[in-house]
Amino acid sequence: MVESDSSGIVRHSQGEFDIVQVYKKFLQDDPEITMPVAAIEALVQLLSRSQAKTISEFMDILQNGSNTLKEGVQNNISLSAGCDIFQRFVTRSLHDVGDFEQCKRHLVENGKLFIQRARACRQRIAHLGYPLIRDGSVILTHGFSRGVAAVLLAAAKRHVRFKVFVTESRPSGSGCLMTRTLKNACIPTCMVLDSAVSFTMNRVDLVLVGAEGVVENGGLINQIGTFQLAVFAKHAHKPFYAVAESHKFVRMFPLSQYDIPFSRPILEFDDPSPETVHPEPEPIPTPSDAIHNELIMNEEQIRNNPTLDVTPPEFVSGLITDLGIIDSKSGVSEELIKLYL
């Protein structure tokens, strides 16, 4: 019997395994690891410690581990993609099983090989994507993305001269990390307010963003603000490319922004009744602390806002992936068909 609970514990006949804690430790120990790869690492570790005696028990452990991860982690879009692809990989490997113990060892070893290949995706993406960065061009990117950084750093190493606008990317402020990464590589950068994107767009030659997930119709799920970049880019006739590893292709088909599964209610109106006392909340630190700190949103207000948005495929010029630069409208569905059929 295999069980799991909301605390992140997978319970099976051989004991307990805190898969959410293991997943978080992988992310903490390796800043370069992506969420789906960390999820696959945690699942491989779960399977390697299991003493399952049958295929059914083995698959139950894997299924419960995946479900526990999805339920125990907020913003689990890319994590879910990694779990689903790894489950499909394991299912395919179970055909024509002879000796189960030998098969189990083979699966764990192949799982580790799967991780190695997933980790190598970013290098291939950088190699495929850097030719899009032309000499003398100006790039606009949104916050921090390891994939986007890899493409830009690959271009810089080949002595391509370019400049980068980086959005601050509130509320995370991850644009600060991207700016620091690019400056360390001697790439000229300028951080811009999220609200200044439309003002900046006419000076831009190419928009390059990352993705938390790429959905079935080729649309993107990414940090909030990505869609507005895409809208402004399309209006200004600027190419808009997204960088994403193929293990971020996710079996979802959101029809609107509200189809993204958030872990809590968002955009709730507060209670303006005179009976309700609203104490003045403490402002939280942000990159804008030096300017009118008393006017920034507090933590409660930030939590009431979405962290992700959906960019429809018609706004995406192409996807830079480890499988090549593919058309967002047809390429993703074709690759998902190959994976799941």
Curated annotation (Swiss-Prot):
UniProt-listed GO biological process terms: cytoplasmic translational initiation; negative regulation of TORC1 signaling; translational initiation
Query: Where is this protein primarily located?
Result: cytoplasm
Q: Which SUPFAM superfamilies match?
A: NagB/RpiA/CoA transferase-like
The UniProt keywords, alphabetically, are:
Cytoplasm, Initiation factor, Protein biosynthesis
Question: Could you tell me where this protein is found in the cell?
Answer: Cytoplasm, Cytosol
The protein's matches in InterPro entries, at most eight in alphabetical order, are given as: eIF2B_alpha/beta/delta, elF-2B_alpha_N, IF-2B-related, IF_2B-like_C, NagB/RpiA_transferase-like
Supply one GO CC term from the record.
cytosol
Query: Which superkingdom heads the taxonomic lineage of this protein's source?
Result: Eukaryota
**In the UniProt annotation, what is the result of changing F253V?**
Decreases the amount of gcn3 in the eIF2B complex
**Example GO molecular function term?**
guanyl-nucleotide exchange factor activity
- Assembly behavior: Component of the translation initiation factor 2B (eIF2B) complex which is a heterodecamer of two sets of five different subunits: alpha, beta, gamma, delta and epsilon. Subunits alpha, beta and delta comprise a regulatory subcomplex and subunits epsilon and gamma comprise a catalytic subcomplex. Within the complex, the hexameric regulatory complex resides at the center, with the two heterodimeric catalytic subcomplexes bound on opposite sides.
Which family is this protein grouped under?
Answer: Belongs to the eIF-2B alpha/beta/delta subunits family.
Q: Tell me, in a sentence or two, what this protein's role is.
A: Acts as a component of the translation initiation factor 2B (eIF2B) complex, which catalyzes the exchange of GDP for GTP on the eukaryotic initiation factor 2 (eIF2) complex gamma subunit. Its guanine nucleotide exchange factor activity is repressed when bound to eIF2 complex phosphorylated on the alpha subunit, thereby limiting the amount of methionyl-initiator methionine tRNA available to the ribosome and consequently global translation is repressed.
- Identify this protein by name: Translation initiation factor eIF2B subunit alpha
Native species of this protein?
Schizosaccharomyces pombe (strain 972 / ATCC 24843)
